[in-house]
From Swiss-Prot:
Disulfide bridge map: 302-308
Residues in the signal sequence: 1-22
Residue ranges listed under propeptide: 381-405
Lipid group attachment sites (GPI-anchor amidated glycine): 380
A GO BP annotation: xylan catabolic process
Glycan-modified residues: 27, 69, 171
Name the UniProt record assigns to this protein: Endo-1,4-beta-xylanase 5
Chief site of localization: membrane
Tagged with keyword Ribonucleoprotein: no
Organism the protein comes from: Pyricularia oryzae (strain 70-15 / ATCC MYA-4617 / FGSC 8958) (Rice blast fungus)
PROSITE patterns: GH10_2
Length: 405
């Protein structure tokens, strides 16, 4: 931790009101997992956050929200759907951010970081994007308008944006979409440049699934990073979605090696949508332990790579997981069961992070509202480079044992 970062952290502590301390303590005791949750352990182990997806459809579920609101468990929230194009601009130029604003308000009230998802994606598009007879000029203008309005609306509040999501097929070719059909690969630079202009401080990510191991798709994703850098376009990170299967998850060493391949391109990396589903249900005790092992492999790989800044799970609970609907007959992919009880996978991840925290160098951890600089983390660089993004939410990712009230 640099001296500057330490001073920033102390400034944040001095700025915190007694009410904010009380809010932190209420959050820290929420849920059913005890005082030392995954986020606090992850931060002590050297990550910036351990977070989860959620959205407004879940907000009325009090037992669920007691866990999601617990900053000791989750230091970052990403909305599942309420920031996607279909949700925010159903008709050209008519924007609605009501649900996304509710997610942002939740993170501000809790002192959590906000991850923002997703801007240019072939799926969940409004009809006008799918059906208009676009030209290069008109589609470029539509992309720039959508991104400038949405990213501008949330400017200063998003740690990162998934600027382009799932642009390539398994064989490494580009997905068919209005964007690629009309603009070729130029849609990548158009999207990233628009996002950078609308919020210079947000991290800009390419996000995809099935890039956790080497192959044509991962190579194509690396090609996107190289292409943007060659064009002088800022890209700060690559998101590994991590939708994996119990028993087929690569080893910790294999996963870390793949993370490092991307980090060597000069970007930070993170797991953005982690869940590990069982192939069949109900789940045996042996299968539950296998799932726990696989979760440890994934999260351990992030700990092993300096440029891996954190982990996001795609919902904390099986109750709201997308898996059963999308992959019938499979499921139970999350860390909590449908009744919000921690599963063996949770216990194993907690033990992993606790062990890593116990051996991590002692340092003062920056609060959630002090984000890493926009300069990409290079392979071998430390996790300590920080810049101030406002100190008003200064509590959520502190080392929670430092100050006891």
């Amino acid at each position: 931790m640099t001296r500057l970062a330490t001073l920033i952290t102390l400034a944040g502590l001095l700025a915190v009101s007694p009410g904010a301390y009380a809010q932190r303590n209420r959050n820290d005791t929420g849920g059913s997992t005890g005082a030392e949750g995954l986020n606090s352990l992850a931060v002590k182990a050297g990550l910036l956050y351990f977070g989860t997806a959620s959205d407004t459809r879940n907000f009325a579920d009090e037992p669920y929200m007691s866990v999601v609101n617990n900053t000791n468990e989750f230091g970052m929230i990403v909305p599942e759907n309420s920031m996607k194009w279909e949700a925010t601009e159903k008709e050209p130029g008519r924007f609605s951010f009501a649900n996304a604003d509710r997610v942002r308000a939740l993170t501000k009230a809790n002192g959590q970081m906000l991850r923002c998802h997703a801007l240019t994606w072939h799926s969940q598009l409004p009809n006008f994007v799918k059906t208009t007879a676009w030209t290069r000029d008109t589609l470029t203008a539509a992309i720039e308008s959508h991104i400038s309005n949405e990213v501008g609306h949330f400017a200063g509040d998003c740690y990162a944006w998934d600027v382009v999501n799932e642009a390539v097929n398994e064989n490494g070719s580009f997905r068919d979409s209005p964007f690629h059909r009309t603009l070729g690969t130029d849609f990548l630079a158009i999207s990233f440049r628009a996002a950078a202009a609308a919020d210079p401080n947000a991290k800009l990510y390419y996000n995809d699934f099935n890039i956790e191991t080497p192959g044509p798709k991962a190579n194509a994703a690396m090609g996107i990073v190289r292409l943007l850098k060659e064009q002088g376009v800022r890209i700060d990170g690559v998101g590994f979605q991590g939708h994996l299967t119990v028993g087929s998850t690569p080893s910790r060493a294999q996963l870390a090696s793949q993370l490092q391949r991307f980090a060597d391109l000069g970007v930070e990396v993170t797991y953005t949508e982690l869940d590990i589903r069982h192939k069949s249900l109900p789940v045996s005790s042996r299968a539950a332990q296998d799932q726990a092992r696989d979760y440890v492999s994934v999260i351990g790989s992030c700990l092993d790579v300096t440029a891996c800044v954190g982990v996001m799970v795609w919902q904390p609970t099986d109750k709201y997981s997308w898996i059963p609907e999308t992959f019938p007959g499979t499921g139970d992919a999350c860390l909590f069961d449908a009744n919000m009880n921690p599963k063996p996978a949770y216990t194993s991840v907690s033990s992993l992070l606790a062990a890593a925290a116990a051996t991590a160098p002692a340092s003062v951890v920056p609060p959630a509202s002090v984000t890493t600089s926009k300069t990409p983390i290079q392979a071998g660089a430390g996790r300590e480079t920080v810049s101030i993004a406002g100190l008003t939410l200064a509590l959520s990712s502190l080392a929670f044992g430092m100050f006891m009230l």
